[in-house]
Amino acid sequence: MGDIVQNTNFIAGTKVSSIGVNSTTCDRDSTNTTAASSQSVKYLGLTTAYTSASGTKSIIIGGTFANNTDSEVELTVHLYDNSASATPAIVSRIPVPNGSSFVLRDTGKTVMEEFDGIRVYCDTANAIDVQLGILKGVN
């Protein structure tokens, strides 16, 4: 649960909320009007790239997300807000060409409270190298 659903019939950022024996439930409705059996749906697992330490705050300065594969990949980055149990998207479904990178800057100096985190989703396993600029220990 918590994986992102990647399909043209789901809004970017749609997540799996529960998994049953014969079904998967998402946190948003599909825009598709045909049966799910006739479509391909991909689930992207998350990687937590950073978690703010207990009792402190951190500020995201920026980051570089490098594609280390021979193919284009798609990248989504979320900020996990532990106090609200919410994960707003910082960027969603960004294409990163092979041998290239996506640079995150001017994030408005986003403040992360304790246990908040940066979560990275990619449509190809182990395809993105992440380097984050974070100011730690802010009170």
Protein language model regions, located:
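Intrinsically disordered, low-complexity Pro/Gly/Ser/Thr-rich segments with frequent PxxP/GP/PP motifs
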Residues: 83-117
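Predominantly extracellular/luminal cell-surface or secreted proteins
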Residues: 27, 78-82, 135
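Acidic glycine-/aspartate-rich tracts in secreted/extracellular proteins
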Residues: 20-23, 29-33, 68-71, 82-85, ...
